[in-house]
């Protein structure tokens, strides 16, 4: 990361709100190189009234252990181990179409026929089709904001009468696009 910052005077960290490890690495590299660091905050989504919010994937998984119905996991491959104690036939993870994504599914013994390997974000219509095709009753997601297709997932859940479970964003400090652009103008 420090090599990428060579010659830069400012670094804008616009990583996913849940990419805490990447943010830490970027911040440390900026400190090491003396590059000015700014964290861009994505606007949080307005959560639908009937959504269920948990702090962690483990809490969501524990809740889902006592429910019935198929579960679409759109939280990413790194969160899959939290759901390993749920009847695996109920789990339908939507992961990136990479070896790492597939291996993460295999590590918790998800049947290949249940793996949805696609790269998003996804339209409202595609989300609806997936919910209907796999008879999903629960969708677990992170609030990735508009960039992450959160509202399309939420609207598809509403349309298909699927319960929406949201993993709360990590608390962080940051800035708006406007304030970061203003700082960039000052540096010109």
Over which residues does each language-model region extend?
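Glycine/small-residue-rich loop that forms an oxyanion/phosphate-binding "nest" at active or ligand-binding sites
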Residues: 2-60
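Anionic-ligand binding region
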Residues: 69-115
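Short acidic-hydrophobic, aromatic-tinged amphipathic segments that line or gate anion-handling sites
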Residues: 51-58, 175-183
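Structural motif
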Residues: 9-10, 70, 137-138
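Short acidic active-site motifs
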Residues: 1, 59-60, 79-82, 100-101, ...
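Short, flexible loop segments at boundaries between secondary-structure elements
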Residues: 100-101, 163-174
């Amino acid at each position: 990361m420090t090599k990428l910052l060579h010659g830069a005077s400012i670094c804008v960290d616009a990583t996913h709100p849940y990419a805490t490890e990447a943010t830490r690495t970027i911040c440390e590299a900026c400190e090491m190189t003396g590059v000015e660091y700014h964290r861009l905050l994505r606007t949080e989504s307005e959560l639908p009234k009937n959504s269920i919010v948990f702090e962690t994937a483990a809490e969501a998984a524990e809740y889902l252990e006592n429910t019935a119905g198929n579960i679409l996991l759109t939280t990413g491959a790194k969160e899959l181990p939290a759901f390993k104690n749920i009847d695996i036939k109920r789990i339908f993870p939507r992961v990136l179409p990479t070896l790492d994504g597939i291996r993460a599914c295999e590590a918790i013994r998800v049947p290949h026929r249940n793996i949805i390997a696609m790269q998003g974000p996804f339209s409202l219509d595609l989300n609806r089709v997936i919910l209907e095709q796999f008879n999903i009753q629960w969708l677990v997601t992170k609030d990735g904001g508009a960039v992450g297709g959160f509202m399309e997932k939420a609207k598809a859940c509403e349309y298909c009468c699927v319960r929406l479970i949201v993993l709360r964003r990590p608390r962080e400090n940051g800035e708006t696009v406007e304030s970061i652009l203003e700082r960039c103008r000052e540096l010109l």
